[in-house]
A protein has these predicted regions:
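Noncatalytic modules at the cell exterior or secretory-pathway interfaces
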Residues: 2-15, 183
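Accessible peptide chain termini
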Residues: 1-2, 248
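PRY/SPRY (B30.2) beta-sandwich protein-interaction domains
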Residues: 24, 28-248
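Short beta-strand-plus-loop segments that form exposed binding edges in beta-rich domains
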Residues: 9-18, 222-226
Length: 248
């Protein structure tokens, strides 16, 4: 049997004990230490980099939060959008009436005939003056006083209040969510009965029928908070693997 090993090289420096410097197998030299071949340059790519601008960027078929949506401008609270359009920081303010205190919304409408899903990591909320869900372009804020309907909106507040086009549900701990929760939003515009389902840490939190004529909708979040309160949400529209599998 012919060995593929064709040579060995022993190296000794100034009388020191020698070491194996290279091995040649089938004409290929394996050396120690490694040396650069030609004009090769190091790369700054890091496979463990979690910065979305570096890993994937903002281009592609995925939604992000829309920093150009006028509702995210200063409307009492101030909305900051960063991390490639996937993180929003909200700082409370009271310049406008409650129902007009703004939203952050996705760049894409949710087209009819499909199922849509996103996850929201609730990194911090100062109180329950914040809501998540879907909203049409007509919605300028999540909050309406006194149980009034909220046309174009299906939004769940942290204390469990739910705002929808023909009414409002009151506080309910069974629908509540808080700092540290991972909220999934599943919108089914494909089935005969259209629905939005809210998940908390993979468990169903609440489901409501959607009137598609109130749309088109975008994923949205907003706060009604006054000064001194802040909130931070991290969205995933599919740019990265979801923590929990989307529903069928």
């Amino acid at each position: 049997v012919t060995s593929p090993l064709t040579s060995l090289s022993l190296v000794s420096n100034s009388g020191d004990a020698g070491y194996l410097g290279s091995v040649t197998i089938d004409g290929t030299m394996l050396r120690d230490p490694l040396t650069v071949n030609g004009d090769s340059l190091a790369t700054n790519f890091n496979p463990f980099n979690t910065d979305i601008n570096t890993v994937r960027g903002q281009e592609g078929i995925y939604a992000t939060l829309n920093a150009k949506d006028y509702r995210s401008f200063t409307n009492g609270p101030t909305y900051y959008i960063y991390n490639g359009g996937l993180t929003t920081y909200m700082s409370g303010g009271s310049a406008n009436a409650s129902k007009d205190r703004g939203l952050v919304a996705s760049t894409m409408d949710l087209p009819s005939g499909k199922k849509w899903y996103c996850e929201i990591n609730v990194e911090n909320i100062s109180n329950n003056d914040i809501a998540l869900g879907i909203a049409s372009q007509l919605v300028k804020g999540y909050y309406e006083l006194g149980g009034n309907p909220k046309p174009g909106a299906y939004l769940l507040r942290a204390a469990g209040q739910f705002y929808y086009p023909t009414g409002q549900l009151g506080t309910d701990s069974s629908r509540s969510w808080a700092t540290g929760d991972l909220i999934g939003l599943a919108v089914d515009l494909e089935s005969t009965t259209k629905t939005i389902t809210f998940y908390k840490n993979s468990k169903v939190l609440y489901t409501h029928i959607v009137d598609e004529s109130e749309g088109p909708f975008k994923f949205a979040a907003g706060t009604d908070a006054g000064s001194g309160n802040d909130y931070k949400l991290n969205f995933n529209f599919g740019q990265k693997p979801f923590k929990f599998p989307p529903p069928d």
